[in-house]
Regions:
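FAD-binding core of FAD-dependent oxidoreductases
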Residues: 1-11
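Generic secondary-structure signature for well-ordered alpha-helical cores
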Residues: 17-20, 27, 39-45, 49-60, ...
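Acyltransferase
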Residues: 71-72, 96-122, 153-155, 165, ...
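A short, flexible beta-alpha/helix-coil linker loop
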Residues: 89-93, 126, 190-191
């Protein structure tokens, strides 16, 4: 499942590491270019300790990074030298709950009082994030989840008459409604005539989003 949103909903801390920092060995792949393992804990100190343990090269995952794992639990920094950015479009979004907005602004003031430099930034591609995510992730999911056919992988329905029925009933029973919807959407965006219109375009938007985020981190921590 996700890391950051569930952590936010539960009032705890969640960290989604950089892709390849933590091995994905043992994970059931949903969308390979998005899937990442990360810790959820009550405090940042525990997050650092857990990340030290789970990060690093894994011979069972060729995508895992061979870069040295820092002593995250020993990291310290001068608050006054750190610049934090927040997206102004999020604060002014019409769907934002007033109570959440109020608490968010209170947290900004709290961080400023602690010595952090906090500034608003604009992120024009904000409204494209969800659509881009769904196109790319469902496309990858339709491919990854195709292996769960009830024969080689996944749940197998026992009361079947032939191989074709085994495939149909196993996948129909083994997958939930949301998973089925995502597989169907992914199959659609990868189909002939729609691949360039949806999947290729979403890849280009993701590249623009990546470039924009990298530009932000040139000025902020």
């Amino acid at each position: 499942g996700s890391i950051r949103q569930p952590a936010a909903f539960c009032g705890v801390i969640g960290l989604k590491p950089t892709y390849s920092r933590v091995s994905r060995y043992g994970l059931i792949a949903y969308a390979s270019s998005f899937d990442q393992i990360g810790p959820i804990a009550n405090n940042i100190e525990d997050i650092a300790l857990v990340l030290e343990v789970i990060a690093g090269k894994d011979r069972n995952d060729s995508t895992s990074s061979s870069l040295e794992v820092p002593d995250y639990s020993k990291l310290n920094f001068n608050k006054s030298s750190k610049k934090i950015a927040y997206i102004s479009e999020c604060i002014n979004h019409k769907g934002l709950d007033p109570e959440i907005k109020q608490n968010f602004l209170l947290k900004i003031n709290e961080l400023k009082n602690q010595g952090f430099l906090v500034e608003p930034i604009s992120f024009p591609l904000l409204d494209y994030l969800v659509a881009t995510y769904y196109v790319l992730s469902t496309a990858e999911a339709s491919s990854n989840l195709a292996r769960f056919d009830g024969i080689n992988y996944g749940y197998r329905e026992s009361n079947v008459k032939d191989l074709n029925e085994a495939y149909i009933l196993s996948r129909n029973t083994g997958f939930g409604e949301e998973v089925k919807r995502r597989i169907m959407l992914g199959t659609f965006v990868l189909s002939s005539g729609y691949h360039d219109a949806y999947f290729t375009k979403a890849q280009k938007i993701r590249r623009k989003i990546k470039n924009m985020v990298e530009e932000i981190f040139r000025s902020f921590d």
